[in-house]
Amino acid sequence: MVCSFAGHADMNINPSLKESPMTVKMNIDDQQFEVILHDNPAAKAFVNTLPLQLGMEELNANEIFADLPHKLPSSPVRPGTIHAGDLMLYGTQTLVLFYASFESSYRYTPIGKVIHPENLPAMVDKKKIGVRFNDH
């Protein structure tokens, strides 16, 4: 499995991410996004499921979600503020991609973050969204 590594230690990302974190590609329709992954068991297990095609559903005008084919390890935290571009695991098998920022009391396991999430809201224009994740 080939994974790309970001070489920009000065990027404005979550400090819990390593200096040279692993990244994966995410495609919604013909738009490609880069997702920087957290260094945790859930993110590592997620990479092992790639390539992965999901039909994600819109919910609450701030997220899209889909059940994964297999459970992933979870270590949920209460982030308080969810940021647009956060890729999280809800429970052990539901992948959630947030396209709007808001306050939340829910608990999630962080998987990663879309590096430039500005175009995500425009991609969520229907109830069911095809999303593909690749490790290269």
What are these regions (language model features)?
Residues 15-65:
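N-terminal secretory signal peptides
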Residues 50-136:
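Glycine-rich active-site loops that engage anionic ligands at enzyme catalytic sites
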